[in-house]
Design a protein with these regions (language model features):
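Transmembrane alpha-helices and adjacent helix-loop boundaries
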Residues: 1-354
Length: 354
């Protein structure tokens, strides 16, 4: 009853091609942005910002990048953690070797280097697909881990391999407190999400989806598979690299290569599967789920008067993730985003059954 587009007429192609063509969607999005930019800074504690919201935003951005490659272009990747590591270490090296370089420039250049590495390891996608491509991208994970552990140049000859970021400033403003870091990350996530949304709605996005559905047929109608696949790897790696730089600079502050290990790659893949393949919104759903489930598994036993050790809670977390992945692959392959779409369709006809 409240979610209907009755009387909302479009008089131009531009109006019909809006990201949110229905007025109710625009209102909801504006309300969410108002909550994120106004209510959260006013009400959220430092712990909530540092432990939940900042990791959620950064992981959601990384999931958006991975979803472009896996969900929209159909090229499976198990090297996302490696591309995050390249973005983080490249940004850190620019900051160390070029003192005075702006923080935003460091992060964007880190994304550019992640793009280069992603395209190099995306070249096998021109000849192989499926599990073979997954193994090829898995090689990127092992190679990058080895490089950052064994080549001291990347860590500025640190004996432990651990690197730390100095005091952060952006555009002359400090980025030190939890609130300042949250707002900095939020602005970047909103900008890159809008860019990703417009890309997948444009010509290049349609090429990615054509390659995903049937690359031979896409080539027959004039789409160049090499350009489409490598562009998907480039865009995905850039966004993931930016997310990796944010993860190191904003969330961790000090890290080592194990912060971007294979477990991180699988975690991001789980986000995309649970949230919904081929859905930008699903990336946020998946990230929220992955971030909140450990919190729930930690707090619910205490609320019930039970006590779980750290190891037991970690095992339960993995069991829940595995069970949910199997559930979504069988019952709803399009994930939480599809359930959200079904809910909106029900609202359109409520209170009528059909």
């Amino acid at each position: 009853m409240f979610y209907r587009e009755n009387g909302q007429f479009k008089t131009s192609y531009r109006a019909d091609q809006q990201i949110f063509p229905i007025r109710q969607d625009r209102i909801v999005m504006l309300l969410l942005l108002a909550v994120a930019f106004i209510a959260v800074p006013a009400l959220a504690s430092d712990y909530f910002l540092r432990a939940i919201l900042i990791p959620f935003l950064i992981l959601a951005l990384a999931a958006v990048g991975l979803n472009i490659l896996v969900g929209y272009c159909g090229q499976i990747s198990l090297g996302t953690g490696a591309f995050m590591a390249v973005g983080a270490y490249a940004a850190w090296n620019f900051g160390v070797r070029f003192p005075g370089m702006p923080l935003l420039a460091q992060i964007l250049l880190g994304g550019c280097f992640a793009t280069l590495v992603g395209v190099i390891f995306g070249i096998p996608s021109l000849r192989i697909r499926g599990l073979y491509l997954a193994v090829a991208t898995l090689a990127a994970q092992f190679f990058v881990d080895w490089a950052f552990l064994r080549i001291p140049f990347f860590t500025n000859y640190s004996s432990s391999g651990n690197v730390s970021v100095p005091q952060l400033t952006a555009f002359g403003l400090p980025v030190q407190s939890a609130l300042e870091k949250y707002l900095f990350v939020l602005i970047l996530v909103v900008v890159f999400t809008l860019l990703a949304k417009n890309l997948v709605r444009g010509a290049i996005g349609r090429q990615w989806m054509a390659i995903r559905d049937m690359d031979v047929a896409a080539a027959v109608i004039g789409i160049r598979p090499m350009y489409a696949k490598l562009s998907a790897f480039a865009v995905s790696s850039f966004i993931v690299g930016v997310a990796g730089a944010l993860w190191g600079y904003i969330h961790l502050g000090s890290w080592e290569p194990l912060a971007f290990d294979l477990a991180r790659s699988f975690q991001l893949l789980f986000m995309v599967i649970i949230g919904g393949l081929g859905s930008i919104l699903g990336s946020f759903f998946g990230a929220a789920f992955i971030v909140l489930v450990p919190v729930a598994l930690t707090n619910i036993p205490h609320m019930l008067g039970m006590s779980l050790s750290v190891d037991t809670a970690a095992h339960v977390e993995h069991m829940v993730f595995g069970a949910l992945i199997v559930f979504f692959l069988i019952a709803e392959p399009h994930g939480l985003a599809r359930l959200w779409s079904i809910g909106k369709e029900k609202l359109r006809i409520w209170p009528f059954p059909h």
